[in-house]
Amino acid sequence: MPIVLVRPTNRTRRLDSTGAGMGPSSHQQQESPLPTITHCAGCTTAWSPCSFNSSDMETPLQFQRGFFPEQPPPPPRSSHLHCQQQQQSQDKPCAPFAPLPHPHHHPHLAHQQPGSGGSSPCLRCNSCASSGAPAAGAGAGDNLSLLLRTSSPGGAFRTRTSSPLSGSSCCCCCSSRRGSQLNVSELTPSSHASALRQQYAQQPASASQYHQCHSLQPATSPTGSLGSLGSGPPLSHHHHHPHPAHHQHHQPQARRESNPFTEIAMSSCRYNGGVMRPLSNLSSSRRNLQEMDSEAQPLQPPASVVGGGGGASSPSAAAAASSSAPEIVVSKPEHNNSNNLALYGTGGGGSTGGGGGGSGHGSSSGTKSSKKKNQNIGYKLGHRRALFEKRKRLSDYALIFGMFGIVVMVIETELSWGAYDKASLYSLALKCLISLSTIILLGLIIVYHAREIQLFMVDNGADDWRIAMTYERIFFICLEILVCAIHPIPGNYTFTWTARLAFSYAPSTTTADVDIILSIPMFLRLYLIARVMLLHSKLFTDASSRSIGALNKINFNTRFVMKTLMTICPGTVLLVFSISLWIIAAWTVRACERYHDQQDVTSNFLGAMWLISITFLSIGYGDMVPNTYCGKGVCLLTGIMGAGCTALVVAVVARKLELTKAEKHVHNFMMDTQLTKRVKNAAANVLRETWLIYKNTKLVKKIDHAKVRKHQRKFLQAIHQLRSVKMEQRKLNDQANTLVDLAKTQNIMYDMISDLNERSEDFEKRIVTLETKLETLIGSIHALPGLISQTIRQQQRDFIETQMENYDKHVSYNAERSRSSSRRRRSSSTAPPTSSESS
């Protein structure tokens, strides 16, 4: 079914009855490029909820009480008893819109004149398109465009064309006031296939046509607010026959507590039975939605609009609906059910829309063809891991059935030799059991190789399985099937076996069973043990080890796993292999020799074990010799295996006796200390003997030649001892410089060189910084003369201006002073003479 992913964002805002935003995002309301839907008076109904609750809906769209706090809850007004019961049974209405008269109570509001869409005082909403045949035909072009989009930029649910909706309009609110506007730019309609199917089953076909959004339905049906999906005629509802089951079903759902802000952003339309799931990680929503958008397929509901007057379809309305229906893109469905197609193609009256069914079939084939092409790396890794687990499980089952067949074969062979013959029913039953286990084993092997081919296709991106079928793979598959198919056939079949006895060389002829030829090759099934060990190895299943191995070009196969086991626990591996080979070879020699061994020498199990042991160890006493070529061949293989195991034992013992690195370092340190002491002692002996020789030859009156020769011999011995100790010390130093120590020294030198390189790079960076600073300083120095000259000129200009101002002041002062002196002289000349002057 199609999956619609919606990412909740902070862009979700409340909407009041006029379409204006409330809350923290109200300032974005004016910037929204999407138009608003204007509801006219004809689409207003009594107050009813629009909570799209359903039992199969994951995130229903519910409007809590108080979602529009600016409007007081209006009193319930309805002309029918059903409307009053519906209003009383709802605990949490979606939006308390003001009640207005119903269209069918006021025909002058519901039915308008054809062709008067342009002169209408209000814009016609989507719900008014199907009020009648004339109105639907004429008002199809007058409907306002409804844009459906999600909050994410690369959403997987969007409309590709913005066209008017006539018959298939989805109303987000089923009631409003006169002249109210509702912005649906942030809302996505929601519809449910299950609720629609229940409504189609419950509502009978009727000729009376009501408005799709105005019919009062039970609260559990989402079509009361959504209308029809364009797949049939509008449903007629009888107000005087309320269904009690609807109220009982709505009561537990209406009490569901939810956040209106989150639900508005996360609610989406489940077209064709789709399921909405919110994204768990917001950081990956853009990438996921873009991937889904590349695989999206358009789903268009068929244009089946039925007008009034007995349910006759209107051609003009159907044409307008088919031409103007929005193309809604839904994510790629995994399974297209016939019920989902029938939801769009079948109407309430039984009419089927062929266009919807054809569109669904085309989208189904398109999605199936593009499913494998658009698989991302996450899907491939998950599919590859699942194939790994299945292959490991198949290998385990194959080993179980293979070992079961071997055990039953051994039991049947031993019982038929001592308890009963091959013609008994017990032997037949055991052989039938062996055959059954062999058939199951062959089936498991075939399925195992099929899984390997699927893994090859996933790893190499191949589309056809024939690409993986190389001649080498086909040969090994056929060889494996042939090896596992060998088993004793039910029935008693014999042949004549002739051999020559060991010591008497007399011919021996006897009648042997064919089962001996078919039983011994069953031990070849033990190769399944190596496969199981490989698939269960930590080196093979761990992703980190496989990544490191791939970087180092290491192939993780059975050989590599056996090498690691021989490195980790060589003694255990050799012990298990030797004991298993010993027991199997001894039983095989017993089964081969029992038809020609009259003295019961090699046909005895203990005697056969002795023969295999001395052959395995390459001793060969000669007291026991096989008579048949079968026994001789088993002894030959045992001798070869014994030589190899003996060499491995010697290598393992030598490795165990070898000193470890720490032990070598301790041993070298102790030997170096001892050699240092010996060098000191030898040097002291040389000095002592030299002194004694000097004393006995120079400091005595009578020279004792015997004593002098004795000290000379000791002196020569001390020199020789000193030289030998120094040679041993030099050899010890050479032995200490092993490959591991050289590697360690190389690592130390590499670290030193790396440190020097880092220091040189740091030094170069500092030099570059210093050069940059020097260049800046040189530029500043070059610009200094200009700055100095400019400063001098400015200071000179200021000085001149100051001097000019002082000069002007001085001149004005002198002029003022001269004027004042002349004024005083003039006043003194014009003054009358005094009495003293006159006398």
Swiss-Prot record:
Renumbered residue ranges of the record's region Calmodulin-binding: 672-748
Regions that enter the bilayer but do not cross it: 605-625
Activity regulation as described: Inhibited by bee venom neurotoxin apamin. Inhibited by UCL 1684 and tetraethylammonium (TEA).
Compositional bias of kind Low complexity: 198-212, 219-235, 313-326, 828-839
GO cellular component terms attached to this protein's record: dendritic spine; glutamatergic synapse; plasma membrane; postsynaptic membrane; sarcolemma; smooth endoplasmic reticulum; T-tubule; Z disc
Cell compartment(s), UniProt: Membrane; Cytoplasm, Myofibril, Sarcomere, Z line
Pfam families reported in the protein's UniProt record: CaMBD (PF02888), Ion_trans_2 (PF07885), SK_channel (PF03530)
Main location: membrane
TM region positions: 398-418, 428-448, 474-494, 516-536, 565-585, 634-654
Annotated Basic residues bias: 236-253
Residues carrying Phosphotyrosine: Y420
InterPro entries: CaM-bd_dom, CaM-bd_dom_sf, K_chnl_Ca-activ_SK, K_chnl_dom
Homology family: Belongs to the potassium channel KCNN family. KCa2.2/KCNN2 subfamily.
Function: Small conductance calcium-activated potassium channel that mediates the voltage-independent transmembrane transfer of potassium across the cell membrane through a constitutive interaction with calmodulin which binds the intracellular calcium allowing its opening. The current is characterized by a voltage-independent activation, an intracellular calcium concentration increase-dependent activation and a single-channel conductance of about 3 picosiemens.
Name listed for the protein in its UniProt record: Small conductance calcium-activated potassium channel protein 2
Originating species: Mus musculus (Mouse)
Gene giving rise to this polypeptide: Kcnn2
